[in-house]
């Protein structure tokens, strides 16, 4: 099968410099959603017709399996498909999709392709309560489709029809090539309509059949930011529905955003306002508090994530206790039963089982052993202005509050670092190491007194 995706439109009503098909739904361009769906049909030729912002579109979705055709002037959908003809295989049917209609399901497209077979022209249609703005499906007395009439060219009788054309069609490519060559632009828009091929098919004795999607929202397109927001909510609602059906507890299904792939084990609970980006996996019994942002992260079984945490490219071990207001940056790997508390930032560090940094700390480029306690205000001073250096804290180390660990530095097994220490050399095992200025009391000192204003 050939698949052609039309993605040349400017999208004036979007009021944006970004090509319309690159506006995101669930964190990825609308066009990427359409391409992902198209790929599940295993097409032999996959062609994207670009126009406005062509280079941006090529850069965003270019891949080895995608060919591009350019529509320099946007002269209608029929004209757009004409640009793809040199790239198509006449021995196989062609399916036409739209880069700004991102939610059409694979099952719906398979149903349309199956209905059309190898010799018929298939049209995806829906009935709408208010069909204003859409091309109407005109049938004869026997119920056969005879033509599609666009809204601006329709009579009052035709405008009363509620069955509309979604624009998605499939037909034999050799016929399509012949029909497109005969299109005229003598209509109110001055464009070459792809829908006019239906009347050509009828005249040539090619049967025209229709199929319908499982839900109306599958065929909704995006022409404005309002419609983009509506599509986003529909998509997120569908994701939430699938999560609920899989056994995930969502404290408010209307307040979750998945911008990638979220997989969950059993008995997972997600509070309101959470955002999941990229590939995220939550193992059995995980609880995620309100308003967390989690990107490309695995969270181990039984972990409890408190509200307002941010994770990116991280791994949380089983039974972890994280947050609130904790940040795990790329390269963070936490072992079992690790506690990371409020206003703690971890970056490119490995922290082994049962270790804790409960509040107000920065741990960067560090290797932390088991049962380590990192006191409040501890900082790994990992950057010298040019290079990053590592800090090593071996098992059973205790770091007192307000300690600066100036990397590269190692604290040996069982060592204790006194509060307020600036550590610049290795601390030996099982000993107390500290550095601090001599404490003094000045008996003759007087606090300055602020003079009253005159």
From Swiss-Prot:
Metal-binding among keywords: yes
Active site: 359 (proton acceptor)
Pathway: Nucleotide-sugar biosynthesis; UDP-N-acetyl-alpha-D-glucosamine biosynthesis; N-acetyl-alpha-D-glucosamine 1-phosphate from alpha-D-glucosamine 6-phosphate (route II): step 2/2; Nucleotide-sugar biosynthesis; UDP-N-acetyl-alpha-D-glucosamine biosynthesis; UDP-N-acetyl-alpha-D-glucosamine from N-acetyl-alpha-D-glucosamine 1-phosphate: step 1/1; Bacterial outer membrane biogenesis; LPS lipid A biosynthesis
Cellular component terms per the entry's GO annotation: cytoplasm; membrane
Chemical reaction(s) catalysed: alpha-D-glucosamine 1-phosphate + acetyl-CoA = N-acetyl-alpha-D-glucosamine 1-phosphate + CoA + H(+); N-acetyl-alpha-D-glucosamine 1-phosphate + UTP + H(+) = UDP-N-acetyl-alpha-D-glucosamine + diphosphate
Stored Gene3D superfamilies: Hexapeptide repeat proteins, Spore Coat Polysaccharide Biosynthesis Protein SpsA, Chain A
Cofactor(s) recorded in Swiss-Prot or TrEMBL: Mg(2+)
Principal EC category: transferase
SUBUNIT field: Homotrimer.
Role description: Catalyzes the last two sequential reactions in the de novo biosynthetic pathway for UDP-N-acetylglucosamine (UDP-GlcNAc). The C-terminal domain catalyzes the transfer of acetyl group from acetyl coenzyme A to glucosamine-1-phosphate (GlcN-1-P) to produce N-acetylglucosamine-1-phosphate (GlcNAc-1-P), which is converted into UDP-GlcNAc by the transfer of uridine 5-monophosphate (from uridine 5-triphosphate), a reaction catalyzed by the N-terminal domain.
Record-given protein name: Bifunctional protein GlmU
Native species: Cupriavidus metallidurans (strain ATCC 43123 / DSM 2839 / NBRC 102507 / CH34)
